């Protein structure tokens, strides 16, 4: 196994994982690509919302940082391989918070995809999650065809620059299919719908460059 990825879904964060492992809401990019990641040799830990409550506005709070600490500690019981954190849209706020909370050397890197960088209904962005405290390598992925107003691809360089103590890289992609009229839907260019294999492959190449095996 190459490593384990902590996956933080976007939106309200509630994917409704059942006790038997079934996932009721699996449209989100970091959830629906779990099998692609498994084929590439990565274990995946999908982080669900706490008590099925919306995570909007909670991901950058100190209370949630304590939860993230518990998640990191749990992940270390699963593997001694490189540990990653990946989030998409609102979930990128959580991934950024993991990166800024982790101890030195604890994470191999963080991946932020279609990150919320403009304040919307949640009232928080990746800039509220203390990006200056991130020390692990970071990848900011931005789809030039994403038209979600709270995640403009043009701000990707600004997100990377905010992680001033990290070796942060920006990856631009293009394409995707809009199955939903909502530009912030998982089933749109915002969620890499239709280009999942390409995006996962691009991210995986960066990850391998960070931790060659």
Task: Annotate the PLM regions.
Residues 34-54:
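Conserved alpha/beta-hydrolase
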Residues 16-27, 150-153, 184-189:
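Short, flexible/disordered intra-domain loops and linkers
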Residues 19-24, 33, 53-62, 142-145, ...:
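Second-shell loop/turn segments in exported
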Residues 109-175:
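The feature captures the conserved acid-bearing segment of alpha/beta-hydrolase catalytic domains
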Residues 1-36:
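Short, surface-exposed "cap/lid" segments of acyl-processing enzymes
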Residues 29-33, 55-78:
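Alpha/beta-hydrolase active-site loop
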Residues 73-133:
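Primarily recognizes the serine-hydrolase "nucleophile elbow" in alpha/beta-hydrolase
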Residues 166-213:
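C-terminal catalytic histidine-bearing segment of alpha/beta-hydrolase fold enzymes
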């Amino acid at each position: 196994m190459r490593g384990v990825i902590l996956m933080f879904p976007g939106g309200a964060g509630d994917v409704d994982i059942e006790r038997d492992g079934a996932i009721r809401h699996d449209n989100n990019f970091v959830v629906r690509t779990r099998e692609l990641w498994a084929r590439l040799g990565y274990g995946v830990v999908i982080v669900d919302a706490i008590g099925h409550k919306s995570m909007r506005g909670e991901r950058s709070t100190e209370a949630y940082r304590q939860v993230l600490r518990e998640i990191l500690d749990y992940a270390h019981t699963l593997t001694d391989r490189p540990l990653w954190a990946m989030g998409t849209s609102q979930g990128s706020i959580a991934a950024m918070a993991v990166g800024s909370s982790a101890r030195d050397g604890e994470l191999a890197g963080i991946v932020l995809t279609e990150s919320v960088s403009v304040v919307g209904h949640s009232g928080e962005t990746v800039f509220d999650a203390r990006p200056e405290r991130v020390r692990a390598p970071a990848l900011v992925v931005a789809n030039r065809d994403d038209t979600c107003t709270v995640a403009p691809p043009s701000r990707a360089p600004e997100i990377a620059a905010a992680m001033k103590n990290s070796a942060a890289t920006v990856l631009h992609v293009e394409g995707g299919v809009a199955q939903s009229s909502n530009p912030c839907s998982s089933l749109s260019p915002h969620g890499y719908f239709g280009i999942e294999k390409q995006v996962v492959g691009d991210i995986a190449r960066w990850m391998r460059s960070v931790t060659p095996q």
